[in-house]
Swiss-Prot record:
Its main location: membrane. This is NADH-quinone oxidoreductase subunit C. PROSITE patterns: COMPLEX1_30K. The keyword Kinase does not apply. Belongs to the complex I 30 kDa subunit family. The gene is nuoC. SUPFAM superfamilies: Nqo5-like (SSF143243). Gene3D superfamilies: NADH:ubiquinone oxidoreductase, 30kDa subunit (3.30.460.80). It catalyses: a quinone + NADH + 5 H(+)(in) = a quinol + NAD(+) + 4 H(+)(out). One of its GO terms (cellular component) is plasma membrane. It is an enzyme of class 7 (translocase). It comes from the Bacteria. Its EC number is 7.1.1.-. One of its GO terms (molecular function) is NADH dehydrogenase (ubiquinone) activity.
């Protein structure tokens, strides 16, 4: 008898065919990678196909792969990652779609398929700059209206570009260039023989 994850994998392979760029099992979970051009069609099938039945999107986030792993990442830089749940079949799936353009990352919005994607897509847009084409209200959700850049991108400076403070003379909040001096972080050396006060 096949396990749930084997059954799901077989169902996905049968339903999606060549539209599944990759389908990998790791740590008891399946990750499906699809092209941005197939993303909406695949998402609808994941929801509507009874052999799959992913009626609920439980999470969506952005990822910046600029420096992934041990060095520079070779593939596309930005991806949107969805976590789907099938209550009827009691299984989960991770779906990853890469934006084809690193300079202006655009992927289709899945708000019309799973309305719970609304604020998740806004968050990924705000923090990573991933544009979700077709989103009904794509604007910042966590950062300030005048915020410059996208703070979760790996090339965004840790201290940011501007800082905000209250100016008592102007009696309002003002923006000014960052006054924090850059500092070099020296890694702490851990001596295994004396770590945590323990003697070996």
């Amino acid at each position: 008898m096949a396990s749930k994850i084997e059954t799901l994998k077989a169902n996905l392979e049968a339903a999606l065919g060549a539209r599944a760029v990759s389908l990998v099992e790791a740590v008891g979970e399946l990750t499906l990678v699809v092209k941005a051009s197939d993303y909406l069609e695949v998402a609808k099938q994941l929801r509507d196909d009874r052999s799959l039945g992913f009626e609920q999107l439980i999470d969506l986030c952005g990822i910046d792969y600029q420096t992934y792993g041990d060095g520079a990442y070779d593939g596309p830089r930005f991806a949107a990652v969805l976590h789907l749940l099938s209550v009827a079949n009691n299984w989960r799936l991770r779906v990853r779609v890469f934006a084809p353009d690193d300079d202006l990352p655009i992927v289709p919005s899945v708000v019309d398929i799973w309305n719970s994607a609304n604020w998740y897509e806004r968050e990924a847009f705000d923090l990573y700059g991933i544009v979700f084409e077709g989103h009904p209200d794509l604007r910042r959700i966590l950062t300030d209206y005048g915020f410059i850049g996208h703070p979760f991108r790996k090339d965004f400076p840790v201290s940011g570009y501007v800082e905000m403070r209250y100016d008592p003379e102007e009696k309002r909040v003002v923006y000014q260039p960052v006054t924090i001096e850059p500092r070099e972080i020296t890694p702490r050396v851990i001596r295994e023989d004396r770590y945590g006060g323990l003697k070996h």
